[in-house]
Amino acid sequence: MRIHVDQDKCCGAGSCVLAAPDVFDQREEDGIVVLLDTAPPAALHDAVREAATICPAAAITVTD
């Protein structure tokens, strides 16, 4: 699994952090997404896919 986040698209909603807190965080100053783990373990793949699906700005791309 490869994860790409587009910080220019991110609106700071935080949905990704709620769905996969071990993989995503937000910058303190503006809430923009930060990718914590570029290659998460298989146990987190479903949560990462969910985060990408629910992102209101479509700022997260996941490829296998």
From Swiss-Prot:
Induction (free text): By herbicides.
Record-level Gene Ontology MF annotations: 3 iron, 4 sulfur cluster binding; electron transfer activity; iron ion binding
Sequence positions that bind [3Fe-4S] cluster: C10, C16, C55
Keyword rRNA processing: no
Pfam families: Fer4_13
Domain 4Fe-4S ferredoxin-type: 2-29
Keyword terms, alphabetized: 3Fe-4S, Electron transport, Iron, Iron-sulfur, Metal-binding, Transport
Xref: PROSITE patterns: 4FE4S_FER_2 (PS51379)
PANTHER family assigned: FERREDOXIN (PTHR36923:SF3)
Role this protein plays: Electron transport protein for the cytochrome P-450-SU2 system.
Protein name (database record): Ferredoxin-2
